[in-house]
Swiss-Prot record:
Classification lineage: Archaea, Thermoproteota, Thermoprotei, Sulfolobales, Sulfolobaceae
Gene Ontology terms: cellular component: cytosolic large ribosomal subunit
Family recorded in the similarity comment: Belongs to the eukaryotic ribosomal protein eL39 family.
Keyword Nucleus found: no
Alphabetic keyword roster: Ribonucleoprotein, Ribosomal protein
Molecular function per GO: structural constituent of ribosome
Protein name: Large ribosomal subunit protein eL39
The organism's place on the tree of life at top rank: Archaea
Function comment: Binds specifically to a region in 26S rRNA near the subunit interface.
InterPro entries per the UniProt record, alphabetical: Ribosomal_eL39, Ribosomal_eL39_CS, Ribosomal_eL39_dom_sf
Any one of the GO BP annotations: translation
Keyword field contains Translocase: no
Amino acid sequence: MSKHKSLGKKLRLGKALKRNSPIPAWVIIKTQAEIRFNPLRRNWRRNNLKV
């Protein structure tokens, strides 16, 4: 990937980075373990971003 990225691409990559985190422990407690994991988790090697 190029070193110089456009602002739109940077914003999309930043959003994807934030979205890729696990859900917080307090969410599991608050929902009585109804929500256990983040279904949107993505591994950089397995899945490509359509950015």
